[in-house]
Amino acid sequence: MKIIKVTVVYALPKIQYICQVDIALGSTVKDAILESNLLNLTNDVSFHHNRIGIYNKTVHLKFKIKDGDRIEIYRNLTIDPKEWRRNNIFLSKKLKKIY
């Protein structure tokens, strides 16, 4: 059985979890995440609430991984993007008035 190396990544604002995993060829994304033990390191990660991707492309948990893949676990948005832009515009206008 051939062994491949993949990286499982989950990033928070102040800390990053990066786990190198040696796993059998033909394994799935879910297998690699379980092997990384990332689910036990933080309570923020869940198969039901987080999207998963490989190199910024969303994939399903049953997707077969290849040697060298970087499996990324994405965080949920904490603020609506439209609301964030509104707040930024408001702050930038406020700062312009000061100067």
From Swiss-Prot:
* Pfam families membership: Ub-RnfH (PF03658)
Q: Per its UniProt entry, which superkingdom is the organism in? A: Bacteria
HAMAP family assigned: UPF0125_RnfH (MF_00460)
Q: Indicate the family of this protein.
A: Belongs to the UPF0125 (RnfH) family.
Q: What is this protein called?
A: Protein RnfH
